Amino acid sequence: MKQMNYIINEENELRFFSIIESLLFASGEPLGLKDISEIIELNTLDTKEILQKMIREYEIEKRGIKLIEIEKKYQLVTKEENSCFIEQLLKTNSSQSLSQAALETLSIVAYKQPVTRVDVDEIRGVKSDRALQTLLQKSLIKETGRLDVPGRPILYSTTEEFLKHFGLESIKELPSLEELLEEFQEEDL
């Protein structure tokens, strides 16, 4: 698609806000800057500027949604303070929550990624096949390749869904293991 060089003024900026908001809403998934830019036929620099303004506007306004950036992609999400109402709507039940084994497995994948099933099993001390399958089904982890050793075991890493689920923009926002250890030690006191 051909990109146009619009002069961004208040009128067409509002029009781009509207178009981008519609795209993000209809998509339901994060959209990359380049994709948005191509669809609205605007250069990436101006598109990024509009997206940043949109993020600020959503923060200021008393709305139920906000625009977030996750690993250089943009998505409309509900505000955290409304999560209890969303849960009621979706009637979240305990069968949808993660088991202790799945949480342990997810933690290992998050901190050691990319990681093989054997690595996870060794750290947990038990088999993790079922937990890995659950996490794959819930799209919290994904297969990201194979290790170049005999048997070529599958490598697992976390997904964008993992980041969204835990309110992170990047895996770098995870607390360090040292911080977690410190926190647990303080709780024990």
From Swiss-Prot:
The gene is scpB. Its main location: cytoplasm. GO terms for biological process: cell division; chromosome separation; DNA replication. GO terms for cellular component: cytoplasm. The lineage of its organism: Bacteria, Bacillati, Bacillota, Clostridia, Eubacteriales. Homodimer. Homodimerization may be required to stabilize the binding of ScpA to the Smc head domains. Component of a cohesin-like complex composed of ScpA, ScpB and the Smc homodimer, in which ScpA and ScpB bind to the head domain of Smc. The presence of the three proteins is required for the association of the complex with DNA. Transmembrane segments: none annotated. This is Segregation and condensation protein B. It comes from Clostridium tetani (strain Massachusetts / E88). It is found in: Cytoplasm. Belongs to the ScpB family. Keywords: Cell cycle, Cell division, Chromosome partition, Cytoplasm. Gene3D superfamilies: Winged helix-like DNA-binding domain superfamily/Winged helix DNA-binding domain. The keyword DNA-binding does not apply. NCBIfam families: SMC-Scp complex subunit ScpB (TIGR00281). The keyword Metal-binding does not apply. InterPro entries: ScpB_csome_segregation, WH-like_DNA-bd_sf, WH_DNA-bd_sf. Participates in chromosomal partition during cell division. May act via the formation of a condensin-like complex containing Smc and ScpA that pull DNA away from mid-cell into both cell halves.
